[in-house]
A protein has these predicted regions:
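Short, solvent-exposed beta-strand-terminating loops
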Residues: 1-25, 61-72
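Extended catalytic core of nucleotide-activated donor transferases of GT-like folds
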Residues: 8-11, 39-55, 64-114
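Short amphipathic alpha-helix
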Residues: 19-38, 45-52
Length: 114
């Protein structure tokens, strides 16, 4: 079973995370590298599904849907337009991953979002 798990960012944590890891606008990093740092750092670990913790990314795709730096890296690597929105990226990720289940922690979206 393929699961797309999405959670929203907590601004102060992302700022502290980037400071702790020396991430700036000039940092050269890929989506996979930044994503792995987030997972290793324990971001939202109490909410993440166990396969994400075990790095079984072929079964679970976990992302922080409104963490701009992360999502824009994914968008660039997947050929999305530079002016795409976080929602555009989110939908593209679901279409790309083709999950059986969408597990979303952002209460602002209703099921008809997808």
């Amino acid at each position: 079973m393929r699961i797309h798990q999405s959670i929203h960012k907590y601004g102060p944590h992302i700022e502290a995370f980037e400071l702790r890891h020396g991430i700036t606008v000039d940092t050269k990093i890929s989506f996979s590298e930044l994503h792995q740092l987030i997972v290793d750092d324990g971001y939202a670990s109490v909410y993440r599904l166990e396969p994400t913790l075990d790095n079984l990314n072929n079964q679970v795709f976990f992302t922080v849907w409104n963490y701009e730096r992360l999502q824009l890296l994914w968008a660039k690597e997947h050929g999305l337009a530079e002016n795409c929105t976080m929602n555009d990226i989110r939908i593209a990720q679901v279409r790309w991953f083709q999950p059986d289940v969408i597990y979303d922690f952002s209460g602002r979206y209703r099921p008809d979002f997808i």
